[in-house]
């Protein structure tokens, strides 16, 4: 059977797997963003804590995905819950790091100027630090999104479903069409997500000022 014929016969199953994969990845990224960005901001005010938190997050990143999923399975059982917990743990580090770095590397002159015109600390955060650090934050989110879409294929091993179901079932049954039906949409999804976030990154990145008379 050709791959095109396989898709004609099983297109609805592939679309359902894609839907689950998108939901699993989106939920994991959303939770990671809600945790990581505030944490990264808080860490910019506490350098000692930042070193410890980033070190722990870095250690988590070095643990193989299958090991983390196995731990999630033992602690939380089968299904999407352990998969989301593991994916969130993996997604957090790049966002925390980029949030922390993006804000810490802002030129102190901007902060001093904001204080000089009477801005409060919260005003400085929301009107100066976050806007200037946003390109770095978005870059961290992009990295996490691409990683999570790929790592979510492993979640099928603990019953979370998604495109990984097709890949792992295809591998176990030596069904090339099934493997491709899972791998190709996952790759395309990752590429599209990366391109969309690249556009967002360009939109939030400050443009250099043009001086009249410059070539």
Language model regions located:
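Loop-to-helix entry region at the N-terminal start of transmembrane alpha-helices
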Residues: 17-24, 73-94, 134, 178, ...
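Cytoplasmic-entry segments and transmembrane alpha-helices of multi-pass inner-membrane transporters
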Residues: 39-71, 87, 97-101
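C-terminal transmembrane helix and the adjacent membrane-cytosol boundary/short C-terminal tail
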Residues: 47, 104, 180-215
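Glycine-rich helix-loop "coupling/hinge" segments at transmembrane-helix boundaries
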Residues: 73-74, 151-180, 184-185, 211-214
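Generic alpha-helical transmembrane segments of integral inner-membrane proteins
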Residues: 26, 30-38, 42, 88, ...
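Periplasmic/extracellular loop-to-transmembrane helix junction in inner-membrane transport proteins
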Residues: 1-28
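Transmembrane alpha-helices
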Residues: 26, 89, 122-154, 186, ...
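Short cytoplasmic-facing helical segments at TM-TM junctions of multi-pass membrane proteins
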Residues: 99-137
